[in-house]
């Protein structure tokens, strides 16, 4: 038996933010990030619509990129004091991810963060509040997923939290919010979405329900990502939809080792944080070459290439074309090809790679990767992504 879970309601299209005024409740906590939603007037619209719905509103502002355990606990404390029956998160993946974790600690104040790390081990939610997610970036798709990523900066580890309980009740996918994304964010989030769709399609848990979503998302991203990066308004709107479709796919099919590697390297190096989408973009072609040694995965990668209209007279040629296309995207989006190009220092990489490999193998996303991997091969794969060497194992 398998399960397929989505938000109960998804409102999409220009102006769909106004659906907030139709929510039924008494109190709402709005969780938001660094200030762009306030600067562009969207936060005020959210507050106004919720008040029009008859709700008292409290704000939790300042969620940082890659939210920390400490931020989650502060937000949960505000919720415990205010007592909302709606949690509304607006912004990129970070405030929505943070709000999902806050939700668990609001409803179960005695829960420890360590209790939530085990996949699909959350307590039953919605005893106090429902959840509405409003994305402003076109990548994470956390508005429709059962996932959240929280960082423990003391340990230098990103923890993917996974449970169908944290799939939002309502998602509002309004393309007006995505029009404000800067180019670099458009690039990173767009390649995050592409990675979601590709990993979902080759996952060991893919099914008839997830495959069409993943393939259509890939086709849309292939068509619209570079145009969106260059500021095309229609392409921005289509990318906002495409990333959401990719999220529906991976929330139910799960992911693979591209994400395992990104989770465990994002906060690992002293030279600076690697943005999640950027890490995914770097690792994706290397992982495709590793996974394509599995015959089932190889055929599914070839099918992706066919759907994208790429050239290739045989399966291997199609897989090569897919990897070349991803490399081309990264060049056009100004994303580095290797960790070394990103700026990771060689000595620190060598010092930490064995431990990172061990942690990546233990990541929640590794279990649904189409080809098994052990710490030794993970270390070799990470080394390829640092030096740009061929994956021949």
Residue ranges and their predicted role:
Residues 70-176:
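Glycine/threonine-rich beta-strand-loop-alpha-helix active-site module
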Residues 139, 244-280, 363-368:
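Glycine-rich phosphate/pyrophosphate-binding beta-alpha loops
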């Amino acid at each position: 038996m398998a399960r397929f879970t989505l938000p109960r309601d998804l409102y999409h299209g220009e102006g769909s933010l106004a659906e907030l005024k139709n929510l039924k409740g008494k109190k709402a906590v709005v969780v938001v990030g660094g200030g762009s939603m306030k600067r562009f007037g969207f936060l005020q619209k959210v507050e106004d619509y919720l008040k029009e719905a008859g709700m008292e509103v409290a704000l939790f502002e300042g969620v940082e990129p890659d939210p920390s355990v400490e931020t989650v606990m502060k937000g949960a404390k505000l919720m415990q004091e205010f007592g909302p029956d709606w949690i509304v998160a607006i912004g990129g993946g970070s405030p929505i991810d943070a709000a999902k974790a806050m939700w668990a600690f609001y409803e179960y104040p005695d829960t420890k963060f360590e209790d939530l790390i085990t996949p699909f081990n959350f307590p039953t939610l919605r005893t106090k509040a429902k959840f509405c997610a409003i994305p402003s970036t076109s990548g994470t798709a956390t508005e429709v997923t059962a996932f959240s990523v929280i960082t423990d900066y003391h340990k230098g580890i990103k923890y993917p939290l996974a449970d169908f309980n944290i799939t939002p009740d309502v998602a509002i996918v309004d393309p007006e919010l995505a029009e404000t994304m800067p180019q670099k964010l458009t690039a990173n989030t767009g390649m995050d979405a592409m990675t979601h769709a590709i990993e979902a399609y080759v996952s060991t848990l893919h099914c008839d329900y997830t495959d069409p979503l993943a393939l259509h998302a890939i086709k849309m991203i292939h068509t619209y990502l570079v145009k969106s990066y260059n500021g095309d308004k229609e392409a921005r709107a289509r990318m906002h939809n495409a990333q959401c479709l990719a999220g529906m796919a991976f929330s139910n099919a799960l992911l693979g080792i591209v994400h395992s590697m990104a989770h465990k390297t994002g906060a690992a190096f002293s030279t600076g944080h690697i943005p999640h989408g950027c890490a995914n973009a770097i690792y994706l072609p290397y992982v495709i070459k590793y996974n394509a040694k599995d015959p089932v995965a190889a055929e599914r990668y070839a099918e992706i290439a066919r759907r994208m209209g790429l050239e290739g007279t045989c399966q291997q040629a199609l897989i090569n074309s897919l990897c070349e296309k991803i490399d081309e995207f990264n060049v056009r989006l100004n994303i580095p090809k290797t960790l070394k190009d990103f700026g990771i220092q060689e000595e620190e990489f060598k010092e930490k790679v064995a431990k990172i490999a061990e942690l990546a193998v233990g990541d929640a996303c590794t279990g649904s990767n189409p080809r098994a991997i052990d710490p030794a091969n993970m270390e070799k794969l990470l080394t390829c992504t640092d030096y740009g060497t061929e994956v021949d194992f």
